[in-house]
Swiss-Prot record:
Binding site for substrate: 20-22, 35, 59-62, 136, 173
Protein name: Phosphoglycerate kinase
Subcellular location: Cytoplasm
InterPro entries (UniProt xref): Phosphoglycerate_kinase, Phosphoglycerate_kinase_N, Phosphoglycerate_kinase_sf
Principal location listed in the UniProt entry: cytoplasm
GO MF annotation: an example: ATP binding
Keyword Kinase carried by entry: yes
One Pfam family matching this protein: PGK
Gene3D superfamilies recorded: Phosphoglycerate kinase, N-terminal domain
GO cellular component: cytosol
Source taxon at top rank: Bacteria
Length: 419
């Protein structure tokens, strides 16, 4: 078990804490504060315990990569591009520090860099909070060279006696502020958000209450194959939806019309189906579809009542017969993990499958099942349908929760002290 902030004495200690404040920004204004609010319990606890100071660090997008993409798009559209204004509007932590200050009703000081801030840290009043600038303004943060990462990690380690990692969303990244820093601080513990994520995800991987159902959706088999393989070990049923379902249907010799499929992953999909059959895991693929002729929000929805899709159509969502199968399985499950939508829920006409899946998972939760929703799109879906609070746990880490469920060791967790 990893140690948390509750396992160490924080009184009069200087704390350096990695948070995940990678929030959507527009013109220097926070658009969604979910991730900031998620860190508040740990921040408040540290302050209540009488810490000497609290230094917070986070990335906020990837300034150089994002600016390069935005510049290319502007050039393509024949529009002017002001790189400095773009970065100031999207990647600066100062507005986040001000926003946090408003939530805490406490002053939050801001440092314009992650390097050379020791005097500023020392000058903080008792219980003072300092927010460092975006860690990714320093190339050392994400460097592939360990020695280069260590330059930033050593500097950051000077700001605290205790390192707290509460950024589950970046726990799968081996960066200077998420893992390397732990080599230069004697006490390394998890915050409450990190602890909560592990508490809910670990049983799904190692010892879930049976029957256990995994609902895996999204566009590509390639990005989900490792999690499918991993969940196969414990799942009683595997519901495969979204764009990736058509690769599996094609393997079974079904007609998929113009639907998305991955030629290169046909063999992988076939092996997975064979493995599931050997292990007695029930695989549920769509038996009917909501289709359209084009991939667009205004496309006309066409119900195809069979598994085979006509040549002129593409699958966009699951149909009512498929949802009836989902209902039977989901409502009889004791644990459920859901990663990825089962249709193009962003388009109103093709959102029913994902909405109904969310409602079924919520109903199973009410019946006592342990339910976890992870992955950006499925989280966005439960939020869209106002069902997030009806799930046992909605994970804050897209890639991190996926890698955790794949059974991978996450650097941001592996670097912490254990009991």
């Amino acid at each position: 078990m990893i140690k948390t902030v509750k396992d160490v004495n924080l009184k009069d200690k200087r704390i350096i804490m990695r948070v995940d404040f990678n929030v959507p920004m527009k013109d220097g204004v926070v658009q969604d504060d979910t991730r900031i609010r998620a860190a508040l319990p740990t921040i408040k606890y540290i302050l209540e315990q009488g810490a000497r100071s609290l230094v917070l660090m986070s990335h906020l997008g990837d300034p150089s990569k994002d600016a390069k993409k935005a510049k290319e798009k502007a050039e393509k559209d024949g529009k002017p591009f002001d790189e400095e204004a773009y970065i100031n509007g999207k990647h600066r932590m100062k507005p986040v520090a001000e926003y946090l200050s408003g939530l805490l009703k406490l002053p939050v000081d801001f440092a314009p860099s992650c390097m050379g801030q020791l005097e500023r840290v020392k000058a903080l009043p008792q219980g003072g909070i300092l927010m460092l600038e975006n860690t990714r303004f320093h190339k050392e943060e994400t460097s592939k060279e360990k020695a280069e990462q260590q330059i930033l990690a050593k500097e950051l380690s000077l700001y605290g006696d205790i390192y707290v990692n509460d950024a589950f969303g970046t726990a799968h990244r081996s960066h200077a502020s998420t893992a390397e820093i732990a080599n230069f601080v004697n006490t390394r513990v998890a915050g409450f958000l990190m602890e909560k994520e592990i508490k809910y995800l670990e049983p799904m991987l190692n010892n879930p209450a049976k029957p256990m159902t995994a609902i895996i959706g999204g566009a590509k088999v390639s990005s989900k194959i490792a999690v499918l393989e991993s969940l196969l070990k414990n799942a009683s049923s595997l519901i495969i939806g979204g764009g990736m379902a058509y690769t599996f249907l094609k393997v079974q010799g079904k007609k998929i019309g113009k639907s998305l499929f991955e030629e290169d992953f046909m063999d992988t999909a076939k092996n997975l189906l064979d493995k599931a059959e050997k292990q007695g895991v029930k695989i549920i693929l769509p038996v009917d579809h909501i289709c359209s002729e084009t991939f667009s929000p205004n496309a006309e929805a066409v119900l195809v009542e069979s598994t085979d899709i006509p040549d002129n159509l593409m699958g966009m969502d699951v149909g009512p017969k498929t949802l009836a199968l989902y209902k039977e399985i989901i409502l009889s499950s004791k644990s459920i993990v859901w990663n990825g939508p089962v249709g193009v829920f962003e388009f109103e006409a093709f959102s029913k499958g994902t909405e109904e899946t969310a409602r079924l998972v919520a109903a199973a939760t009410e019946k006592g099942a342990l339910t976890i929703v992870g992955g950006g799109d499925s989280v966005a879906a439960v939020n869209k349908f106002n069902l997030a609070d009806k799930m046992s746990h909605v994970s804050t880490g897209g890639g991190a929760s996926l890698e955790f469920l794949e059974g991978k060791v996450l650097p941001g967790i592996a670097c912490l002290d254990t009991i």
